[in-house]
Amino acid sequence: MVAVLQSTLPIIFSMEFIMGTLGNGFIFLIVCIDWVQRRKISLVDQIRTALAISRIALIWLIFLDWWVSVHYPALHETGKMLSTYLISWTVINHCNFWLTANLSILYFLKIANFSNIIFLYLKFRSKNVVLVTLLVSLFFLFLNTVIIKIFSDVCFDSVQRNVSQIFIMYNHEQICKFLSFTNPMFTFIPFVMSTVMFSLLIFSLWRHLKNMQHTAKGCRDISTTVHIRALQTIIVSVVLYTIFFLSFFVKVWSFVSPERYLIFLFVWALGNAVFSAHPFVMILVNRRLRLASLSLIFWLWYRFKNIEV
């Protein structure tokens, strides 16, 4: 079991690194090309671009941390290195969750059909809603960063006073357990927001289909198609981030033996697969990104075919 996990982990981390960089990089490239051609960029594309950049940064950070831990374990164990990684990971992960939540909010405001006066007020001020949400998230980011900084400094100061290997491992275990509590606590709010937006979109689609029965029974109109595509994007986000949250709770259980530590790394890799898998869902759901990806595939196929000939 241990040997299998040891041989599997490098493959998983490498695949996540390659696929995540390619998927998010492709979204960033297509949005930028479209921005240059049209001389303007929509709010949805702005969030997609920021989300792609933050995910690329997070994937590279995770991969570099794993690479340093394998090739330079002494450097990886230093307090300054770990503290820098923890804060960097917290900031970038925070951006990922809140940008995803804002994308869900934007889908809901643009697509859903409600006659409620509050909804209509927010619908025509969707940009302000996104900006206010991001500003509010900065408070949680500041609070989370300060808590992690204080806790990590206390632990690393203790390590400097007691440099025994057992004590160092104990401190690292306590830090990981602490993060497994604080990070889900601070990222649970955007997760709930995405889940609520998903539920409201389902309700909006149900009402729309009910109204359609009186006009064009059995016919799928544009609004229905848009609802379904938005729901596909959000539900995948909710499912993937649920896996991400579950991975944190498994980490608390895993710090008992070396075998369980490998399980911790394996679950950690699966949890971070969220940032590599979700961009491909966004590409498949979005018509413009899907057509661009098909064009790229056909172009590559044509180039390789000519090379072989």
Curated annotation (Swiss-Prot):
InterPro entries: TAS2R. Gene3D superfamilies: Rhodopsin 7-helix transmembrane proteins. The chain crosses the membrane at residues 11-31, 56-76, 81-101, 128-148, 186-206, 230-250, 263-283. It comes from the Eukaryota. Residues 1-10, 77-80, 149-185, 251-262 are extracellular. Keywords: G-protein coupled receptor, Glycoprotein, Membrane, Receptor, Sensory transduction, Taste, Transducer, Transmembrane, Transmembrane helix. One of its GO terms (molecular function) is G protein-coupled receptor activity. It is found in: Membrane. One of its GO terms (cellular component) is membrane. Glycans are attached at N162. Signal peptide: none annotated. It is a multi-pass membrane protein. Putative taste receptor which may play a role in the perception of bitterness. Several bitter taste receptors are expressed in a single taste receptor cell. This is Taste receptor type 2 member 113. The lineage of its organism: Eukaryota, Metazoa, Chordata, Craniata, Vertebrata. The gene is Tas2r113.
